[in-house]
Amino acid sequence: MLTTSEVSSDQQQVYHRLGFRLSFRASLWLSLSCCVAAPVLQNSLMPNRAEAWELLCEYTKGDSLRKHALAVEAVMRACANRYAEGPADVDEWGIVGLLHDFDYEMFPSADQHPFTGANILCGRGYSDRIIRAIMGHATYTGVPRDTDMARALFATDELCGFLVACALVRPTRSLDDLEVSSVKKKLKDKAFARSVNRDDIKQGVEELKVDLDEHIRFVIDALRPVQKEIGLNPITV
């Protein structure tokens, strides 16, 4: 059970929005003093991909973060067809990948990201489903990954960055000749791409209930069509 002293104003607004349990005192305080972002109407049209890209570019100016967003978007679109239990909205899954870190450049601290971004998304008309998945990809938020979309985002985010790092140190700078065995070897080398959280990769695979080798191959294949856009070099036609 969380209290108001344990969460910031941005965090309080998002938890309130998503129905995350707070103490009675905290809930009462929120109802009286928090200006929660405008609710999304059930029948409202969610922003499309072009609008999502515009939002990303509004808050993210750096090339590397934009490329990472494009990478995760591509993989999430592939995940929609592979992991969704029912008919998946591929664009919705892609938007989750595109926007999962859109606030990070401006609001990088753990008490801001992804809380500030989630509040912005609330006000822009994005669904709670998208917002919950984005909140869930940061384990410290405490928001459970209780949908296929949320689990897929968590399982692909860190791995996307790691695979791009693996490709960039190859002579070809390509994913086309990157083998799963090479990726696993580099995962064991803690000095390589040290900012990548190996524990998150492991946990993500476990939550998706897939084999690590299979997941690495799947993500490589999902990234190959967008190699040029994310700064890599396709060597096969």
Regions found by a protein language model. Give the residues of each.
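Acidic/His-rich, divalent-metal-binding segments that scaffold phosphate/diphosphate chemistry
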Residues: 43-110
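Charged phosphate-binding loop/patch that engages nucleotide di/tri-phosphates or the phosphate backbone
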Residues: 203-237
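Cationic, low-complexity basic patches in intrinsically disordered or flexible, solvent-exposed regions
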Residues: 12-13
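Cysteine-centered motifs
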Residues: 34-35
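C-terminal binding/interaction regions
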Residues: 194-200, 210
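Divalent metal-dependent catalytic cores for phosphoryl transfer on phosphate-bearing substrates
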Residues: 88-190, 202
